[in-house]
Amino acid sequence: MPWQGVSPMDLRRLFARAYVAGGLSMTELCEHYGISRKTGYKWAARFELQGLEGLGDHSRRPHHSPRATGAAVTHALCDARRRHPTWGARKLLAGLRRTRPTWPWPAPSTGSALLKAHGLVRTPRCRRRGHASPSPLAPATRPNDVWTTDFKGEFRLGDRTYCYPLTLRDLHSRLVLRCDALPEKSGRLVRPCFERAFRDHGLPERLRSDNGGPFAAPGLTRLSHLSVWWLRLGIQPERIALGHPEQNGAHEQFHRVLKAETARPPAAHLAAQQRRFRHFCGEYNTARPHEALGDATPASCYAASPRPYPTRLPPLEYPGHWDVRRVASTGQVSWAGGPLYLTEVLGGEHVAFEEVDDGLWMLHFATIRLARFEARTRTLTPVPYA
């Protein structure tokens, strides 16, 4: 007979009464109530042992769970999450394994489930992401191949002044080389930060930035005073494509972590914010595991550059068959019978003209090509570089 509209518990009670009354075999009872013989014998056994109370739903949890996570492990994981709220289960477990290698730590998926069960995981908002463009920039295969730099977006401090965080990282090891709380974006404040980094860590091969100031400027090849200085030191400036911050994606991700751990809420004043940055960078470099590094720390994967910071800028050297000219403070150079304007940021520097065809010259500065110069029309055509 159909038993629609009857609750499972009422159905079990009816079965138990019919079982006690007798008159029907177990097979007939089970057919009558639409259950299997296995279920019928189970209900009958529970009724005989516990009465009607035995017919209620029983827990499906096993009596013994050999793979269950221990209370001490769960407590340690949750405590680590409270101390590092921006770390996921994978990073937390990697750090805990280093400090307590003999403990039976769970898999990252189990760790995530434990954190969620204890209310320590906040579901992130969905963010629309654009399609990444292929990056033409070379990867870093060892420390100091590429350093990346950027200004994290400014924010207001407790005293109503603004903080402009300047950050500098080694791309290969993820080491934070500098994180400076500056009151403004200006070359006069930025250059000393790079000088300290160069003294502490040596010189990189390439320095990657966006196209904003003071890393770039309007004018010929978007050279700035800062990038001219880098070139004089033998550092190749690299710029990501306009409108493509994903080409510096690891640095952008670092900025999100930096903001979450040091600026929510901001400090009372600039000096206090700098102390937060210093504490964060120490932990980020020496304690925070990185999945891209096999859960190692940046400090364990970094070594200083073998290229020391010079006490004086080395002179520029060009091939002997190039024609070298000194740029005036006005940004002009005398060439082909008249003045030729380049850019004021090259004032006092030496550039070189290489003849590549009859009446056609390539203009060089340090290791980069600046422009093509056509003598007949006196036309200067900039040559873009990365």
Which residues make up each language-model segment?
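Charged alpha-helix within mobile-element recombinases
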Residues: 219, 225-310, 352, 356-357
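Short, amphipathic alpha-helical "recognition" segments used to contact nucleic acids or chromatin
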Residues: 7-24, 74-83
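Mobile genetic element proteins and their domesticated derivatives, centered on retroelements
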Residues: 15, 29, 40, 51, ...
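C-terminal, beta-rich DNA-binding module of retroviral/retroelements integrases
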Residues: 281, 285-386
